[in-house]
Amino acid sequence: MKDMSNKKIFKKYSRVAGLLTAALIVGNLVTANADSNKQNTANTETTTTNEQPKPESSELTTEKAGQKMDDMLNSNDMIKLAPKEMPLESAEKEEKKSEDNKKSEEDHTEEINDKIYSLNYNELEVLAKNGETIENFVPKEGVKKADKFIVIERKKKNINTTPVDISIIDSVTDRTYPAALQLANKGFTENKPDAVVTKRNPQKIHIDLPGMGDKATVEVNDPTYANVSTAIDNLVNQWHDNYSGGNTLPARTQYTESMVYSKSQIEAALNVNSKILDGTLGIDFKSISKGEKKVMIAAYKQIFYTVSANLPNNPADVFDKSVTLKELQRKGVSNEAPPLFVSNVAYGRTVFVKLETSSKSNDVEAAFSAALKGTDVKTNGKYSDILENSSFTAVVLGGDAAEHNKVVTKDFDVIRNVIKDNATFSRKNPAYPISYTSVFLKNNKIAGVNNRSEYVETTSTEYTSGKINLSHQGAYVAQYEILWDEINYDDKGKEVITKRRWDNNWYSKTSPFSTVIPLGANSRNIRIMARECTGLAWEWWRKVIDERDVKLSKEINVNISGSTLSPYGSITYK
């Protein structure tokens, strides 16, 4: 600041000095003119004594002096100093340019290394994603529909996952490419990472396509999204032209499946944004929570190749030396949001499959899982019935998706073909970025999103009404006791039990006798007892049947026969 002030003062007085110099020139001209007039007067007096000379007026003298000064100023001999060409201003520009060059040449590597190494954070906490918190829910609910009674049971569950490969959606590809810089903050956990854009050092990337050898590694001078994408395209084209041998490359398939209970649960289970699944597959979360539908989602990740970025030895290795600590701090780097480095990106395609049914069977998950694994379910009657009453949807992201963008069918064999088709890498079936992995720039530790969520697991069991068919063919007097409970639930999910009994309990019945006792679909804890009169004083009544846990069925056939001393009884189901 002091130097600049001195320069301004010097500039000011230089201009004053210039004005004084001009004034001095004018003075000299006036003096010289006056001396010349005196000399001319003396000569005139010598030659002519009688004639008085006419003195020259001061106005004329000044006018002549001014004219001479103008002539001098306009002559080529005069040095002209235009304001824009002042030597001092030019010097200031040169000095500023020099200072800028010094700043760009200044090395901030040590400063950035020290700061990033000193960042204090917990890897699990900065990338913690807390999903839903469940407080109130109805644990059980009973719904009566015609001859059906549906019990919807809800249980509170916890899920905690730490996936390291994060699904890529189209909206974030420009900040999830190999060697991209990100912030470990909430945006990252929600698959909407914040990018750190700054001047970078050259970066080496490697593609794992077979046969390329050292040609598989290239250096990108300025690792922006556009430049890295171009480099990857060049590597892929080079492989197709020189190393593929005209052959296709089979995909490496990763497979995960999960029943769907809530948005946060399926996000954590499959490591994918529920908005993608909801938008592409159309998941009816409301019907699932009501127990009206059961849904399973399977994700097939088919990887054609992976591109990796060389990990830095030190944090500052990724930055140009001119990048300052203040710049990184302005762009969000802090203890709460430490920097991340995208270490690798997988390219290929992802197939999402939705299996949906309104079946209330407890075997739905097993049936769906068997179908996905290619098991022949036709030999299993229960599984076959479930799949026949199910619908299937497949959505392909990446690859030649134009052929199988979205398929909805009742035939699971069609879904199997979608999964198998275009599962090889070729020019006609290109790869797209499907997932990526990031590391903390501080220590190259893998950054995994710590998903913590509560959800309600909803299961529904459907019961059908039944009946008891009593048949007495024995040569004795018989008595029955038929008891059961009817189950309902109040608005808080608490079980309400109503005791029921047959009106003819303990009434004596002679052979032949038969009757039908209807049972509601919510009947449980069925007890059936039948006894016969022996006529023996020491054992007047003898039990023929005594079953305390008879299961509800469409038809429960209770038969008694035989003699007083050799009675026979049986219970069969239909």
Swiss-Prot record:
Motif position, Conserved undecapeptide: 532-542
Subcellular location: Secreted; Host cell membrane
InterPro entries reported in the protein's UniProt record: Thiol_cytolys_C, Thiol_cytolys_C_sf, Thiol_cytolysin, Thiol_cytolysin_ab_sf, Thiol_cytolysin_sf
Keyword Amino-acid biosynthesis: no
Molecular function as annotated in GO: cholesterol binding; toxin activity
Positions of short motif Cholesterol binding: 564-565
Principal location listed in the UniProt entry: secreted
Keyword Cytoplasm on entry: no
Protein name: Streptolysin O
Phylogenetic placement of the source organism: Bacteria, Bacillati, Bacillota, Bacilli, Lactobacillales
